[in-house]
Amino acid sequence: MWIEETDNGKFKFRENYKDPYTGTWKPVSVTMEKDNSRAYKAARKILEQKITEKIAQLKASELLFTELLDEWWTFYKKELKRSSVASLRGNIEEIRETFGIGVKVVNIDPKYVQNYLDNLDCSRNKKERNKSMLNLAFDYAVGLDIIQDNPARRAKLPRVKKTLEDWKKAEEKYLEEDEIKPLLKELYRRPSTYRLGLLAEFISLNGCRIGEAVSIEPCNYESKSRILQLHGTFDHTEGYRNGEKTAPKTLASYRETIMTSRELEILQELEFMNELEKNTNHRYRDMGYLFTTKNGVPIQTNSFNLALKKANERLEDPITKKLTSHIFRHTLISRLAENNVPLKSIMERVGHADAKTTAQIYTHVTKKMKSSVADIMENY
């Protein structure tokens, strides 16, 4: 650092710094009233701050989007559960390979993001997820003062126009009473799927997610009060044998429900069955959960869904809807809606924080409600 006296009697403190990208030396300066040790110390501090800011600005202006994405993803992963990281990893890889390759972050504008979204050849859900990831990555950049505005949040996805096919799909998300009864009966008919029948019936009565159901432990329910604690979900990222119970994704999912007498019977029956296996089956591994295979490992979602499909194929009148664990959860929502239970109460029961998810099913009236309207008009 050196000092130059100005024409007006003040003192200009100067310093040079090296541009990390060009290798050239560039000047910074600050003018002080006096030339003494106190002014010297103050000037040095100011110049160091200026140099730090200028280098940061240079680095920000040169930062490539792929570098930003990697930096943000490393940070964001720390907030996520292992299952969420595994679920999102594919989206992150796709964005890295298709968006902003070799492009500086500061050069990406809303139009650039819009063109990317418009040209994505994938499902609506995948587009929404990719846009959500871009929103978060650019939010991170705004927070670090790399950019002033988030271009992804200004880009838009077109509103989805509902078609007759969409309405038909929505109505196929749940089972009617004349559909669920024969399906459960078929699951209970075979010893190999009996436990799966208990799981299917339990979800249809409680409305919990399959991950929540298979993470239920004996200590999570109380017989006298019939209170069930749903305080977690089963994370099988490392495989079901190495899985563990983890906290739910949202606060709304952390809940307690009052069980029906049938729900209580199912849990008690499972406790009895597991205790029997523990004492007679040398392959049984006690992992502490209720909804397990006969060997003690929590029931796998894929195996459960496959068993549903095969059981349905054996029915005299197979169900034409896509059968997964979620259809039983949705069935409870439709039943409660059919009985005029308020939307808020249904949301609390099934652990939904967003009314949209429940409302999609809530608004699709079941056959019973449709027929009751017809009966009223018939007698009008």
Where are the model-predicted features located?
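N-terminal DNA-binding module of tyrosine recombinases/phage integrases
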Residues: 7-12, 17-107, 111, 275-284
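Conserved tyrosine-mediated DNA breakage-rejoining catalytic core shared by Y-recombinases
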Residues: 14, 215-275
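N-terminal core-binding DNA-recognition domain of tyrosine site-specific recombinases/integrases
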Residues: 35-36, 74-146, 191-194, 298-303, ...
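Basic, Lys/Arg- and aromatic-enriched nucleic-acid-binding interface segment
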Residues: 124, 128, 143, 147, ...
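Short amphipathic helical patch at the helix-1/turn junction of helix-turn-helix
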Residues: 132, 203-204, 337-338
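Short, basic (Lys/Arg/His-rich) helix/loop patches that form interaction surfaces
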Residues: 187-196, 257, 273-282, 286-289, ...
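Short, polar N-cap/turn motifs at the start of nucleic acid-interacting alpha helices
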Residues: 221-227, 341-361
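DNA/chromatin major-groove-contacting recognition/catalytic segments
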Residues: 239-245, 339, 360-380
